[in-house]
Amino acid sequence: MATLLYLTDLYYQAKGRNYYTEDLYVTSRLKDHFDLLIGHPRQVLSNLDCADLIVFRNTGPVMWYKDYFNRFVATALEKGVRTFNSLDGKADMKGKDYLLQLTAEGYAVIPTVERVEDLAQLGMTEQYVVKLKDGADSIGMRIVSREELLQAPPVDQLIQPLLHFQYEVSFYYLNRRFQYALNAPHKEQRWALQEYQPTAQDLAFADRFLAWNNMARGIVRVDACRLPDGSLRLVELEDLNPFLSLEVLSEGKREQFIQRFIEALQEATVS
């Protein structure tokens, strides 16, 4: 059997969900198909040669170990180390600067700028959201007024309009193939998720970002919000270690995803 090094931070305290529960379940299913090693993301550099494939899963925000992660990526690419996800993503894997690029290119994304001189691009709004470029789990996110922004312009951060939306919805992909969708029908409870049946228009929206990212292999979560007019706007494109919320799925859909995940990992160890 091929050997996997499965990276996770079992002690990370995430908002609204338990990373360790998901990874304990997933690894319990993988162990019958692979020789399985479990490691912490900040120990991977000394273990690059111990597995056929390194699986990057619920490892917490990279912002806490950014320099180490960058060294890992550079070393893995230099040595041709096989990873899942592949390290060629252009979205959250590299921070949130891509939101600026998508805005400039006219994609259906929450409009994003980084300079107060460009606030006009965000339209008329009374409040703004300021985000860290390397943030995750809403860490460092602030809601501020226009006056507050102008008085203390943020440095090396992102600025977005505070949108009033109906709900958030996420589309989950494995090797560019759609798997399932979940939404939070009550925006005040963003982690109270339920299965969602996407329309053809919904999937066309999400597929466009998959095509833009053009990542070779892995799990990608397309997070979006539904505006009052029914349109969708991208919130973020999580292409490094998206939480899967498997516990929300029906037993049949969860089993289907796990089997496809196993097959994708097996393929990645030999391709």
Residue ranges and their predicted role:
Residues 43-50, 74, 119-125, 148-150:
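Short amphipathic alpha-helix with an adjacent loop that forms part of the alpha/beta core around
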Residues 83-84, 110, 129, 158, ...:
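Structural detector of well-ordered beta-strand residues that form the stable sheet scaffold
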